[in-house]
């Protein structure tokens, strides 16, 4: 196969026009097989999954903190509200509004060119930006799940002598988790696709690997199609796993 590629490449250098099949083979070989370029794509996939996982974990942690603050504030009686919690609630609301109301690309550029301008680890900066952005959306997912639990459950826990945090972690959250987890699965899929944005700031994920190949071959079609196909396969795989997980949750609810 390599010998055939070299022979066809020599014909191109000599000005000879290739037929469709030969041209297809040369471009495909250049994009994926020449100098083992497929390894760059594999490395890019690994980085993409790592960035997505880091962003999701960070998003869940930040989202849970924000959701707990907002739910805790909302559940206080109007004339007996903690002023400190009120400040945290206001900060949380403003943060969520700003993050959800501004483009992800702008947030990435601010993180890389302003906040972490001296950092050269663009991949981790991108993961951090994605995680903070995800936290705003995850907070609404978790808050919605917690608020969907019957308020009487909190009152019942408090009447048994449990404090707020114990009631929340032992009674409320276990009930809310069933509605929260499927939505978090969808957030993971969204993060997986959004991870391609970090290539703009130099994050070395899948699209970055494809751009490296394009810069050498001056042929964008196969690298970009390869990236699109890889993302499609990953999304379909995780969507199938998520659907299976949701079916199991539904079955357990019926028992």
Question: Where in this protein do the model-derived segments appear?
Answer:
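Transmembrane alpha-helices and adjacent helix-loop boundaries
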Residues: 1-255
């Amino acid at each position: 196969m390599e010998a055939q590629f070299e022979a066809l490449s020599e014909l191109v250098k000599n000005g000879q026009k290739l037929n469709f099949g030969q041209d297809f083979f040369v471009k495909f070989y250049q994009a994926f097989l020449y100098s083992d370029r497929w390894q760059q794509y594999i490395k890019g996939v690994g980085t993409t999954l790592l960035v997505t996982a880091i962003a999701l974990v960070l998003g869940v942690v930040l989202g849970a903190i924000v959701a707990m603050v907002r739910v805790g504030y909302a559940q206080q009686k109007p004339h007996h509200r903690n002023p400190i919690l009120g400040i945290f609630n206001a900060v949380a609301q403003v943060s969520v509004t700003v993050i959800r109301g501004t483009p992800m690309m702008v947030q990435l550029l601010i993180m890389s060119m302003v906040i972490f301008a001296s950092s050269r680890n663009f991949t981790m900066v991108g993961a951090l930006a994605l995680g903070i952005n995800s936290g705003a959306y995850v907070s609404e997912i978790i808050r919605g799940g917690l608020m969907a639990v019957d308020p009487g459950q909190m009152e019942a826990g408090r009447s048994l002598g449990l404090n707020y945090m114990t009631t929340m972690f032992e009674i409320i959250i276990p009930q809310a988790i069933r509605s929260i987890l499927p939505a978090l699965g969808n957030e993971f899929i969204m993060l997986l696709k959004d991870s391609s944005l970090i290539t703009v700031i130099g994050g070395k994920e899948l699209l970055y690997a494809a751009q490296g190949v394009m810069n050498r071959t001056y042929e964008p079609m196969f690298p970009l199609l390869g990236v699109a196909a890889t993302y499609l396969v990953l999304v379909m795989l995780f969507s199938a796993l998520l659907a299976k997980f949701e079916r199991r949750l539904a079955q357990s609810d019926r028992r």
